[in-house]
Amino acid sequence: MQLNSTEISELIKKRIAQFDVVSEARNTGTIVSVSDGIIRIHGLSEVMQGEMIALPGNRYAMALNLERDSVGAVVMGPYADLAEGMEVQCTGRILEVPVGRGLLGRVVNTLGEPIDGKGEIENDGFSPVEVIAPGVIDRKSVDQPVQTGYKAVDSMVPIGRGQRELIIGDRQTGKTALAIDAIINQRDSGIKCIYVAIGQKASTIANVVRKLEEHSALQNTIVVVASASESAALQYLAPYSGCAMGEYFRDRGEDALIIYDDLSKQAVAYRQISLLLRRPPGREAFPGDVFYLHSRLLERASRVNEEYVERFTNGEVKGKTGSLTALPIIETQAGDVSAFVPTNVISITDGQIFLESNLFNSGIRPAVNPGISVSRVGGSAQTKVIKKLAGGIRTALAQYRELAAFAQFASDLDDATRKQLSHGQKVTELLKQKQYSPLSVAQQALVLFAVEFGYLEEVDLDRIGSFESALLEYANHNYADFMRELTQSGNYNDEIKESLKGILDSFKANSAW
């Protein structure tokens, strides 16, 4: 068979015309060094700050340092098998985590992957971990309460929906216990909860999850875990991941509560990353932007107005406000609240609950120090009945503390001083509360009414605990409807005052506690 040159030429032209050229421009680079979870990459000329970089083995790193001829990135996950010369590439994306109702009741890692062995999670989409906080115009003032179930907190340092209230204290003073009880108390309130565990032992986190399950609170909670065995990068990013999951509910006109346990360990993880990236250290070897690390996180906790929710949901949700309430936890060393990170977070938040080791060790639990614990915006959100009845509590305790200090040196005290000291001791005793036993609004109101109107004067100090438990049992058994209505309404008027007085008078007449 003989082919002439014309046919060959036509055939080649035809094949060339049919050839489909698919070209893909990729921005690739090469690893030049690996050390302690930090990789330096040469060649990624178009990488962005915070961009995800694809590594071999379906892993990612986050670009944090953009230098003249190299990129410093932190590896998210194991890095032992990474070596110099390996090729990496840009993804053009920043870190996103799954969000949605499918996460409720689940335990996930920083990247939103399930680690509880309950199968895949059905998420409603993905959200970037770094989001700009809502602006001033999009916000609404805090005027609805978050009940923790603790008498000492709800009466003296009330928390509102959309507030940032710091829980601060030394190790082993009951900070996590207070936060977990606050989550348990939201079982029937409709508030979704997110618990972010940063740098804790896996056994401690497992215990928290078990307790939430035992008290039927886990189905309403997302647990985000970056344990002590995880890399510094995952511990640093965990609060932002949890916040993105909480914002899903806030932006759809619902209420959410997020616990960061604790931000001291996140700051240490960020310090580790910064020093490995050779950023200049500042006070206590923290980098210069450690304030911004926490401020950009905590500013995302807010109460947003109806227009914001309507705009975000494209008109699907109308006339509803959303809120994300944050309870960050900070661990102090020997009660030093003037250290770098504690002062930073105190200045960012709307108040703090200071837990003191001396009070804790003397059996006063929760160990709230009423002198320096404050809620800057929670007063306007406090339930009316609690606000009305709790007015004298803080004053009584402050006067008691002052008098108690002087009474140690005084040999003879007048009757008025003795009476004030006795009253202060009884109030202190009454504010004690066991873990996992939150009180409803009506129960708290009844106890505070007893304090306010002198029903404790005839009760001996060592009988205060049994007096309270017997009173609450009596009220729940005989006045269940009234207690339920008072919890739901939270109002206070002459009729309610008479009803509370009637319960206490009836209890005193009939009960042998």
Swiss-Prot record:
Protein residues bound to ATP: 169-176
Molecular function terms, GO-annotated: ADP binding; ATP binding; proton-transporting ATP synthase activity, rotational mechanism
Chief place of localization: membrane
Subcellular compartments: Cell inner membrane
Disulfide bonds: none
Keyword terms, alphabetized: ATP synthesis, ATP-binding, Cell inner membrane, Cell membrane, CF(1), Hydrogen ion transport, Ion transport, Membrane, Nucleotide-binding, Translocase, Transport
Gene Ontology CC annotations of this record: plasma membrane; proton-transporting ATP synthase complex
Known EC number: 7.1.2.2
Reaction catalyzed: ATP + H2O + 4 H(+)(in) = ADP + phosphate + 5 H(+)(out)
Entry keyword annotation includes Glycosyltransferase: no
Site (Required for activity): 373
Gene3D superfamilies xref list: 2.40.30.20, ATP synthase alpha/beta chain, C-terminal domain, P-loop containing nucleotide triphosphate hydrolases
Signal peptide extent: none
Bilayer topology term: Peripheral membrane protein
Family, similarity comment: Belongs to the ATPase alpha/beta chains family.
Subunit structure: F-type ATPases have 2 components, CF(1) - the catalytic core - and CF(0) - the membrane proton channel. CF(1) has five subunits: alpha(3), beta(3), gamma(1), delta(1), epsilon(1). CF(0) has three main subunits: a(1), b(2) and c(9-12). The alpha and beta chains form an alternating ring which encloses part of the gamma chain. CF(1) is attached to CF(0) by a central stalk formed by the gamma and epsilon chains, while a peripheral stalk is formed by the delta and b chains.
Role: Produces ATP from ADP in the presence of a proton gradient across the membrane. The alpha chain is a regulatory subunit.
Name of the protein in its database record: ATP synthase subunit alpha
Gene responsible for this protein: atpA
